[in-house]
């Protein structure tokens, strides 16, 4: 099945059939490919090629660069079903999530095409007669993208489409757990490039490998920007290395996202939002809902409703109409069980969280989503666990709810369910949520392309995708032009 998908997507069989490193599907643990890992020497070669590609590509007008991305979006539309199914096989996502991720790629292509005609600078009034000032934006250089397993194709597209319309060349180092989807994306992109006369060779490249390959990309002084998605631990390694050589980084790291459930909330709507946000993608989104901060007046009722909903959710093969697929691997399962044991030791009451379908899928890790009622926001609650665990804590005072929302190291996404406009506005104010995303009456997951995506604190501070995130992929230049016959100095200085 996977081989047929890869064949239709145009991937050379030699790239996924003859390597020494096996690729296993989280669906059933079966081997779906074997890839050859590349290391520092191959990265060095790729960066050299990317430098040449950048030198040519930056000279191509931005709207023309956008045309390449437009054509890539059309190819993604044509192969959406196949690529979405491949995402399911390699990352364990249910059908709708696999298709949705490819749709994100299509959406960011559309956004980037429009952006290619809107890379606006500024005109600035000069204090000197016969002068004008302006601010312009120019291509940056070689961009390195390091992505995680949980969004194996969308995050690459967020970065690459913007990087391309901004005039850069891209090298992608995907997660070692999801190399096949990366090879497929590269094959689809190359279909477009080979018929696009202005596109130089090696405009986009993929490096398949482990930590050595990623480290080589991060350390190379010719790579102007590293955009890295992953754990906070990974970010702590990447950020100092990039900063030491005065390059740029866009970091999208951990999230420990909360929902404040106010006493006036629509509980029917809240249950639906919690279910999607807390158990979707088996709790393996960076924006997964991990903490429910519920007002004491509604806490018991919402927990009762959630337990009923959790008991009915369909768990199983992600391509067979179920709502929860597997965890990515045994390591993910072990981390979940360790967190639940710690929660019990800290006074929590655990509902769910056990392994499921072990007889049917002995080499895969399906679990029932867990609800954990906690007496307080303890250490385990403040730690991100990449699994479907929802911690529930109560509050009585709205100020306390805001404090709990912000009292974790991470700052990615957050939300409030309320019909009280004062609560909603305060939540979004300067004294409200300290996260990069703060939603009202919608969960923390499912961000749209048009808004910049990213968070604060240990989430890394980077922004990807929409709004003005494109500026991270360009260099700013301030210009002063003297069109007079004099040479006046700023601040009224005389130098005669």
Q: Predicted regions: what is each one?
A:
Residues 29, 65, 87, 109, ...:
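Residue-level signal for inorganic ion chemistry
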Residues 121-269, 321, 395:
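Rossmann-like NAD(P) dinucleotide-binding subdomain of oxidoreductase/dehydrogenase enzymes
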Residues 28-34, 198, 223, 260, ...:
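Conserved C-terminal structural/oligomerization subdomain of aldehyde/semialdehyde dehydrogenase
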Residues 191, 233-376, 403, 440, ...:
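ALDH superfamily catalytic-core signature
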Residues 22, 36, 58-59, 91, ...:
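A structural signal for short, well-ordered beta-strand elements
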Residues 54, 58, 73-80, 84, ...:
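Structural signal for hydrophobic packing residues in well-ordered secondary-structure cores
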Residues 1-131:
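N-terminal Rossmann-like NAD(P)+-binding subdomain of aldehyde/semialdehyde dehydrogenases
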Residues 41, 78, 82, 93, ...:
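Short alpha-helical
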